[in-house]
């Protein structure tokens, strides 16, 4: 496969889903099965799942998987990395659909889930990386999802639709200004400790 040295606009998301239940296999399989992945290339192995395609379709599928898993009402965590423009990437193992219709949006629009999140943006080989990170924080503040800076990350909170909208806006802003972007995300839903804190 041909190496394309940072010029690829193939976006990717490699993630692992962790349902905190003995029935974790069915929660994972159900979330993946309910999500329409016809617009992305996807593969699941014994460690993680990867989605590859356009930014539109990668974020569409990622949000749908999270929402379906969270609506199991089990405590779930999604941990993953979005990336675009990796110098070591190839043109293989992808599906860049010509259509921009988000194939999961109608199905998940009515699904609700909390999405407390910690994310970190890494503009690779970018001298003004802190400038881009501060732009990311400003986007989150403007969208009403920013909570605070924490060690090695920024914390977001809100409905999953809003949080994923912020993450996508940050990713798009950064990829328009530098070639290679990675962004790590850690999201949680239905955490017992969070419920106890709210009740207390």
Swiss-Prot record:
* GO terms for MF: thiamine binding
The family database entries (Pfam families) matched by this protein are listed as: Ykof
Instruction: Determine the domain of life of the protein's source.
Output: Bacteria
SUPFAM superfamilies in the cross-refs: MTH1187/YkoF-like
Keyword presence, Transport:
yes
Binding-site list for thiamine: 17, 49
Which of UniProt's keywords are assigned here? Transport
Does the keyword Nucleotidyltransferase feature in the UniProt annotation? no
Task: Describe its assembly.
Answer: Homodimer in vitro. In vivo, may be a part of an ABC transporter complex which is composed of two ATP-binding proteins (YkoD), two transmembrane proteins (YkoC and YkoE) and a solute-binding protein (YkoF).
What this chain does, per the entry, is described as: Part of the ABC transporter complex YkoCDEF that could transport hydroxymethylpyrimidine (HMP) and/or thiamine. Could also transport other HMP-containing products. Binds thiamine via its HMP moiety.
Q: What is this protein called?
A: Putative HMP/thiamine-binding protein YkoF
Organism, by scientific name, is Bacillus subtilis (strain 168)
């Amino acid at each position: 496969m041909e190496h394309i040295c940072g010029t690829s606009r193939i976006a990717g998301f490699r993630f692992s889903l962790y349902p905190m239940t003995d029935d974790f296999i069915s929660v994972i399989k159900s979330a993946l099965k309910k999500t329409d992945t016809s617009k992305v290339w996807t593969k699941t192995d014994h460690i993680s799942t990867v989605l590859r395609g356009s930014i539109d379709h990668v974020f569409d599928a990622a949000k749908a998987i999270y929402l379906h898993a969270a609506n199991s009402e089990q405590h779930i965590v999604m941990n993953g990395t979005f990336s675009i423009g990796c110098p070591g990437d190839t043109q293989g193992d992808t599906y860049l659909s010509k259509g921009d219709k988000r194939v999961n949006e109608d199905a998940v629009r009515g699904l609700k889930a909390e999405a407390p999140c910690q994310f970190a943006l890494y503009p690779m080989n970018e001298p003004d990386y802190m400038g881009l990170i501060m732009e990311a924080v400003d986007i989150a503040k403007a969208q009403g999802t920013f909570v605070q800076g924490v060690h090695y990350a920024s914390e977001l909170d809100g409905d999953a639709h809003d949080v994923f909208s912020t993450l996508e806006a940050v990713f798009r802003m950064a990829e328009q200004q530098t070639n290679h972007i990675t962004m790590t995300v850690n999201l949680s839903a239905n955490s017992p400790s969070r419920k106890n804190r709210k009740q207390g």
